[in-house]
Amino acid sequence: MASVSSKRIPGIWSGIGWALADKSAHFPSRLQLAGRALRGALWHGKALRRWMAMVFELRARGIVTDLPSEYLRALRPYVHSGTGVSIRVVQLIDHADWLETALKPAAFTQITSDAPVMLADLPPPRGYQFLRLQLQRAPAQSTEGDLLLALVLQRSPEVQQRAAPVEVATIAFSRFRIEGQGCFVIGGVRGQRHPVLRLSQVELNQVLSGWKPSVLMLRVAQELARFWGLRLIGLDPAHHPVHRWP
């Protein structure tokens, strides 16, 4: 989606046109997202104007580049069903404010440039060039969180020429306040999703020394939450809308 070049803050009604032009819209469809933008402008105008001003400021500072996609974060389906637009805006602003203080300046610049930040370079097993824990910003279309914590490995050139990095496990999460307390809110835990760049179960067990990827990543999330002074919160499966509009 093309970014907006105007030096004036766009009105929230622009969100309807942005939704209709959103090429990434599969779930929800463009019409569904545009309907959400219309209802949001009618019923949650104050919250959305606040979010529009925030995104405009972030774009002016070079922290985000695609203003329409960032604005639509507040209107897309969220993994916790029943989260209204006004609450979602508060969560997004809280997360954006926290991220700038949680990371060192160099890491913040890196992650806002959509480049992954390496948190730990782990000893790679034999036959692998590296095994890393990295943090990166989630795509604007993500329904599960605003950051991705990923375990990434790459085979050594002796084993595979021009090997590409493989994400073997990922946690999607956000940071916002619940009942006044800062929380590390997990929205999704997933394994390998790439149709080609993937490891067999046997190879994965060898690489992780028998650890299940999801269990290992949750342990890492616990340590990160402790480091940041956050409460670790998981999602109640009863509130997880997988194939429906929240």
Task: Label the model's feature ranges.
Residues 2-203:
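Non-catalytic substrate-recognition and accessory regions of acyl/acetyltransferase enzymes
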Residues 167-246:
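Acyl-donor binding region in acyl/amide transferases
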